[in-house]
Amino acid sequence: MSANGPSHPARELKAGGSLSGHVKVPGDKSISHRSLLFGAIAEGTTTIDGLLPAEDPISTAACLRAMGVLISPIEAAGLVTVEGVGLDGLQEPAEILDCGNSGTTMRLMLGLLAGRAGRHFVLDGDASLRRRPMRRVGQPLASMGADVRGRDGGNLAPLAVQGQSLRGTVIGTPVASAQVKSALLLAALTADGTTTVIEPAQSRDHSERMLRAFGADLQVGGEMGRHITVRPGNTLKGQQVVVPGDISSAAFWLVAGALVPGADLTIENVGLNPTRTGILEVLEQMNAQIEVLNRRDVAGEPVGDLRITHGPLQPFSIGEEIMPRLVDEVPILSVAACFCDGESRISGASELRVKETDRLAVMARQLKAMGAEIEEHEDGMTIHGGRPLKGAALDSETDHRVAMSLAVASLLASGDSTLQRSDAAAVSYPSFWDDLDRLRC
């Protein structure tokens, strides 16, 4: 059920108690999307173990099925198979491609479809997705010859893509965005000539790792791996993909374990890709009691188990440099800041204003309802920690990461809370509420 669908009763959030035990978080959302997309345009069968069975990857699968790709049902704890149609085998769909609430689906689809010469596609989504900016993808694609049109000069869905023969080029992206980069890399696979994408800072690199594993001629160079070059012509081959646990979902348990008195949690099989581990760097800055256990490599991605125990936390300051490595963790870090004695500062986070919600405004509004002292800035917030939070009537405002962040805050409140639209968590973590109940003690 979409968080924007029929309303559910407010969930009661009980304060107090502790947390103990082991938990496996769902498969990484970024890798889940990409394994479906790359498997679809490969030749042969791709099997995916651990794919996230949540709304966003299901939207990606539905779009691919509408273009003739055979994908097995996506179910919890099941293997998913994708029967690839090759680089140019996607069919023109008979219907609008519904991306649901998933910005990743829409942005990566733009890159995937821009070079399907002679075919026409229309992409749409829910009310939230229709407000999210898409020109950041459409504009650089246009420099390759793409034809993407939509509301607000091609910035807002619904979007129409008229497939074209694309040309390779050198493209500098204005922001360090893995979605923008990945869309351009997908387009580059069928372009006429070499394409180089240059980022202002390195963003998560799952696409580069996976495309090479599937057989693409892709090179990474330049300072900090910010120049990515694709030479078209190679055939992609189906692969066996193992999806590690999503560190963005693990972040809720990491912060909860650090904050809740007596807590001792181990999060198993978490992806530790260095472009995603900003949350661990900040927790270390806060003096959190965290251990990385059983480090290993699984299908080209570093993986480990994370143990976190309760202890006092120091205030922190994060800015633009680290933001690409933890942009999805800012909501839960704003909760952590409320329980540090002193002032914490988050800056360089203006990207959060165009996520599923304006996450800076929503987190400030909801935490203030609990008694937090927060000053909101254009690109972040200042949080004056150490003040007790009280139970309150809360609302996820349809955002999955807000819902789970507020759940953690409610554990530390002086009284019980209620949460409207708690079902939003299913977008990335369908079993979150069950896991929370199981870990409480």
Swiss-Prot record:
Q: Where along the chain is 3-phosphoshikimate bound? A: 29-30, 34, 177, 179, 328, 355
Region feature (Disordered)? 1-21
Record pathway: Metabolic intermediate biosynthesis; chorismate biosynthesis; chorismate from D-erythrose 4-phosphate and phosphoenolpyruvate: step 6/7
**Compartments reported by the entry:** Cytoplasm
Q: Record's Gene3D superfamilies?
A: Enolpyruvate transferase domain
Q: Which family does it belong to?
A: Belongs to the EPSP synthase family.
Biological role stated in the UniProt entry: Catalyzes the transfer of the enolpyruvyl moiety of phosphoenolpyruvate (PEP) to the 5-hydroxyl of shikimate-3-phosphate (S3P) to produce enolpyruvyl shikimate-3-phosphate and inorganic phosphate.
* Protein name per UniProt: 3-phosphoshikimate 1-carboxyvinyltransferase
**What gene is this protein a product of?**
aroA
